[in-house]
Amino acid sequence: MALKKEQHFFKGMQRDLSVSKFNPEYAFDAQNIRITAREHDTLLSVSNEKGNKEIPLQSPSGDPVVIDGVLLGQNVLNNYVTLFTKGTNDNIYRLENKGTYFETLILFSGNLNFSTDYPIESISVYENNNIQKVYWVDGLNQARVINITKDDYNNADDFDFVGTIHTSSKIEVSKVNGSGAFGQGVIQYAFTYYNKYGKETNIFRTSPLLYIAYSDRGASPEETVSCSFQINFTELDSSYDFIRVYSIHRTSIDATPTVRKVADLATDTKLYVDTGTTGEIVDPTLLLYVGGEEIAPYTMTQKDNTLFLGNYTLKRSLISTELKNQIKSDSIVTTILGGLDDAIESEWNVNTQYNSNYDLNYDSRIKGFQKGEIYRLGIQFQDNKGKWSEVVFIGDYECTERFKYTQYDTYGITLIPRFKVVISNSTTIQAIKNLGYINARGVVVFPTLEDRNILCQGILCPTVANYKDRLDNSPFVQSSWFSRPKQATETWKTEYSGTNHLSEFGEVPYFQHNEPIGSASLSEITRWEIQTSLGLVPYYNPSTTNAKDFVDGSPSEFLVDENIVTMHSPDVEFDDRLQNITNGKFKLRIIGTTHLTNTLSDISVITSTPTYGNYATGFYKGKVANMNISTSYYGGRQLSAGLFWSDNVKFQDPSPQDKLERLWMVYPWHRNGSLMNMGVPTEGTRAAALQRKIISNLKFASQNNYLPNQSVWEAEISGDANHTGITPVNSWTEGLVRIPAQANSNLGSLNYYANIDKVLTFNRSEQISEIYKNGYLIYTTKDWITDGKIADLFNNAISQTISVDQVQDWLTRIADTDKYGTEPVSMKYKSNPHLVFAFNYTESGKQLILPMKNNNNGYLAPSANSKPFWNPTAPEGAVYQDSINFTNENRAFFWLAELYRDSVVNRFGGDTEEAILNNTWLPSGDSVIIGDSINIEYTEGDTYYQRYDCLRTFAYTNEDQNSIVDIVSFMCESKVNIDGRYDKNRGQVNNLAVSPTNFNLFNPVYSQKNNFFTFRTIDYERFSINYFPNSITVTKEKSLGEDIDTWTNITLATTLDLDGDKGEIVSLNTYNNEIFCFQRRGLSNILFNSRVQIPTSDGMPIEITNGLKVSGKRYISNTIGCANKWSIAESPSGLYFIDNETNSLYLFNGEIVSLSDKLGFRQWISTHNVHVNWEPVGYNNYRSFYDKNNNDVYFTYKDHCLCYSELINQFTSFMSYEGVPAMFNVSSEFYAFKDGKMWEQFAGDYNMFFGEYKPFSITFVANAEEPNDKIFNTVEFRADSWDSDNLISNKTFDTLDVWNEYQHGTTPLTNLLGHPSPLKKKFRIWRANIPRAIANNRDRIRNTWAYIKLGMNTPNTYRTEFHDAIIHYFA
């Protein structure tokens, strides 16, 4: 056999090759050696590893510091190292590199809920010298952040992204008139806390809606109001630096509001006044996401100052179905009236009711709940983060109380109906608290128009009918020009009795059913309305008279109809939806009365020609009404006809008396002619010719009187033959309204007009008296006016009738033509929006009409054999009228009624689980603290109780000869904010110029609901999952140095779901400014900022969501992934990771390369493969670190550490860094942290690791000339050792091991000069004999291959450099 040799020089380490195929350029095993250069020129030569040295940890005062506990995570930011440990306490340390030591400061020690099973992943951001932040996640707790330059942390929750609110603060907002500047509308305030450069909490408190309006009226949509809002703070949370005030300002109803960041105030602030001139406008959607969601992410990364978080758990638990059912069953619901000590009361001085009864100076808590209406009630709970839970449905409840007026001292106060919910079950309350909830409040689903029981509330007024028009149905009835209240006490004359009307308080009498409007009685002339009307009763004898002849002779006659009525409600006037009702099917009930306490009247008369007398007074108004609305018993009277013209009498034969003045009658509907007794002249002009006359009456009712439940009058009673309901309801229109035929009436559909333009002619009728055959009489006072003294029209509260008389025939000096009037009357007027309907007839065919009070006679009854001219077949006693008995003040009144439904189908969408899920819930009041019981008041409803000035009648045009303005002012429940009117004509004495263009100008924004924040119930079975392992969420883009850290606001507005078949998200990593996501069986690229952002139309930047920037994902591999994120290490060359599913160690740098397969370590990885995550105590999987200074990657396990060099792209050695929890670069140095101590790598003695000697060795395979058998003889190697810089000539390796599959030999390598020894050196080459097999110490190592190991086991600190080895063998 010849002696041969095989040379080995090493460029790496491999393990997978078969021993027979092993490459001599690779080591099979290496321990604590380097093939790359460190301090010397040793690249591709083997050198032993230089060990580490401990770096002292000192406090700022120089005292040594001991790190407490197990290291869970670390972060390096410039010269700072942040350590997170779990020990006696949970600790956060900041270590500042001072060169020779680390100055160590404990930033926090306490309970942070750290766990060794949940190591910490972190990233850091340097913003400026004062703001250097470390963000961390652990998959157990919510995401957290610490500014490591700050050292005054006191609370464990100071670090949470979603902050805890520690106190139950009280915040009250009130309006101050007269300073500041706000655009009209409504405003609401929302409040958050924040720390400077840190997090902002959720909105923990919101105010009710406040009204931006003048002190006595609303504002027009274009107006700016001078007012401000005072905010009072009590017990703010001092753990925060600031409280931030937001305003939500709407200038039109349900429009996108203007949201303003008003002010940032120190938390010791007690008072702030918002004048509307400060602050910054922000995106309205900001408030929907402010504070963010509390999630516990497992991994995170960042790109372009945007934070990505993946595999997260929602920390806020849903309320279970069982607990919801328990809350519902334990809730005791009642209806209450807000008491005198409530924060908001609708109040006014009883002596100045009109001006003070104005609710816009308060807030939206003026709204209550409407009696008889059904509301869907729920409860929400607020946790200590300020976040509100999903809604817990309590049930559908009817409000059983009504707004109640009561007098308190000198003030009248309206008590507001509200719901109250009480929960007293201690088990239920504790279960609520166990979920972290501390507050509760009420929420409501308010009924929509379609869901409402009550369509509207308002007063009922009779209609009027012209005889001729009624017979022709052209129209059958028309809107009454006067509102015609019911009288308190009246005895009415019958058709032939001749009894005068008795009116104790001077009311106008012609308001009862079927009564003619007019009279031949001079004692009632001041209450006449139509100059050409004679008061012909509407009954006739069909057997002797033809109905057509009857009405043809009565073209100017009108009657009052209480069977067909109009309903006047603010909901109809101000809600467009109620102005389009056609044949709506509703029911009617009378719930009370509104009593008139005063009337404000005025009149204006303009003539086109002068007075007849040269010096006559002409228009004389006198005293027509009180000048204020203080309460009285005379509210039922009004201005109708009166002696308003003072002029001479025209005689045929002039005499000295013709210069004496008399007062002349002026009527609401006055003739087209002279205001005195001048007829049509044969030549010249007519004196005192009427050009324009306006009469206005504002009837004022201070309060309502509600009937007890048992006295409420129903138009329809099941099984009652006399109460058969009402016809379908129609809304007012400009033109014809057709009232459907009344049941049991034998009549067809009836025509109705609200707006009238007609001319009334005189019939020269003799049905009343022969004296009228030539015309209607012209009336004047009987006596002359002397000394310029004219009596007031209403000079006596008891009897307001002024003595009048006709011009007697014996005054022969008056021409016959001047005793009578024959000119027609122009009747033109319009009505505001209202509803019209008729009562169905009784089953016996009688007219059902409005009820009377306390059995007062309420209608004109026909005599025997007479019938209504429009219904000759009417039964005996053609009218049916109920009487409602109640005790009240003796005042004129209107019936207060409601249109309602009692069979609403699928209210709120139904009561199924699905319907409840689809409901939108609005908050109804502030929160209350959850104590031993829960007491919730629903302080914000949907119903206003306010004054409605109903403009019933107004001028057709401004040029009409006769015009009437009729207004009824009364309190009413409404779904619209009536006080939102912005005209200046409220409560005026003079209403002559009033029309819809300047009266009741309504700004709908004041009816705005508190619906900026809306809520829903949640299907627990569907949404109880709070773990989202395959989801990524993205924050907004962060600006360095911003006051509030954007990254702390996790909105979940943008999420990206990855493929579920690839397992949960394990790690998010950024490489080359691209985000990559590892799943157990997949690797994907998250496409972020891959296309141009698109700005919004108004130029505002995209906020809240980066939805246009995250465009999806692109999978790089559907099979290769990573289950243990701690095995991932990032370097400029790529991402290193171990896939426990495929048993490989990979490098990803645009493509995935298996380094373990390529470089011969697949089997090694497979042998140590486990399917558990790394954690610092058990260390049962790999933890990877990257040394950026030396381009080495360390794959660390609990019992070994594999090093990969990027310089040579090879695995180089196993290092004694096993079980090290952290290795990191600080500046240009590389450090390791182990056992509570900091170690600087490569700064200690050679072979000394963490204060202990660790051997080094290199193992290779000699397998030349395979498959020939060989006898291994000697090994030669070139190697040198140094002690510092001193060459040691007799030291290299101290052990040689050789083995194959059946032999093993070992020998110590000692070099004895001059003596035989296993190791000899000649010409700088070391030679050693291959040891014999230790089995018998005789056999040579013989095989086709052999493992050769050179090692140094003797403790020393020498540097050794090994160049190559040559194996001599016989073959």
UniProtKB/Swiss-Prot annotation:
It is found in: Virion. Coiled coil: none annotated. Keywords: Viral tail protein, Virion. GO terms for cellular component: virus tail. It comes from the Viruses. Homohexamer. Forms the muzzle assembly at the distal part of the tail. May serve as the gatekeeper to control the ejection of the cargo proteins. This is Muzzle protein. It comes from Bacteroides phage crAss001. The lineage of its organism: Viruses, Duplodnaviria, Heunggongvirae, Uroviricota, Caudoviricetes.
